[in-house]
Amino acid sequence: SNNWIGSYQAIKSEITTVNYNPSLAWKVNDKVSLGLGISYQTIDAEMTSAVPGPFSSSQLKGDDSSWGWNAGALFTLSPAMRVGISYRSAVDYTLEGNANTALTSTPVKADVKLPDTAILSVWQQVSDRWEAMGDLSYTNWSTLQNLNVLSSNTGVQIGSEHFGYKYAWRIAWGAAYKATDAWRVKFGIAYDKTPTSNSDRSARVPDNDRIWFSLGGQWNGGVYGKVDAGYAYLYLKDADINQTKVFAPGVTSTLRGSYNDSAHILGVQYSNGF
């Protein structure tokens, strides 16, 4: 809403990325497989907020495209155990677009670097019907400290968004039960550490540590493909915020409060091999 109490900090925050990722895999031997991919990514971003004075609100919009890469390895330690490692590179963008108010539109640009991620995963066949899996992931969110918006014409900074993110990690464990040759039941839990802190938390991303609870199933139709369906409940710790935004000397806005968030996620996937 344009009229909520924190509108001077944020009204709308939207980032959309699309990733095209052709990849190659090489089976070195029965124990080791390697993979390598190239990523071409597009990004579109929009941020709006209220501003003091006659303009009432401002809008920042920008887009760009860039390249990255990813690599991985899978080690078959035994017929009942596999270990995988993977890495996805950071991606650098220079967003270009406009800063808009009711009366003006200024060409702007901003550099942003989305983080690199490393994942270690383990799969274990426990019995004929049970299998267990887990993973530990590290994301280098420290690449995102400030989003400095510059005039494309003069190079002068005309705005800034502070994030102050730190690296974050996630640990997950799950299991699957093979009820029949066609049906499997899956469940899992994960702890996801936030990259922000109480001192840096913003109204744009009022994030905190998260716990995931998930439940799902798979139907294997053989030549007809596979259908997966799942549900996840996402619990977030209450997130306190104390953010002051400076518009000009002596002109500030402060938001103090607490966020209470949760989410319900449903997903369906169909896959087939040729």
Regions found by a protein language model. Give the residues of each.
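Outer-membrane beta-barrel porins/channels
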Residues: 1-274
